[in-house]
């Protein structure tokens, strides 16, 4: 678990640290968000849980199945749940703004199995100066969070496409997310597209890395260091 209350210290993150700047320990730390993205099945939820930080699940901002604006997979009748058009970015950003401003927000509870919202719940992060917002579309709101001064870091988890495929399929079957034929069609499509997905997230401002480096960057944020500009 990361300690968000200790004063800034040397960052364990790897690579060039020129995009980090220290925050004074003598004044209260403003609440900021780490946007955690990556291909479906890349380990975002597991990493978030391991960090011990509060987590906003961006998957809960999916549109419902009867929304006429939902996109379709090209050449298919399947809804394209991997398109940013299937997701309510404005509502997600509004929730992040509320958490950074007041430490509390109401979020939808979304069932992926039924593609519907089943209720709402309160997410209260209290005085915690850092939280994670994780989901496959997190990179799509990097620029907006950066412009509002809310961004601590943006991370894209990267791994082997074959490993991601196996992890994603096992999870989706275990949770009964969709039918097996749908999961297989989606899984093969995403495995072939995975390198392009990571490249897109990087172009949107997320730093692509494996789990250990991601944990190091989270620790740097928890120590009071944040990005001054989006990563190249």
Tell what function each PLM region has.
Residues 54-58, 63, 68-116:
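Conserved nucleotide-sensing/catalytic segment adjacent to the nucleotide-binding pocket
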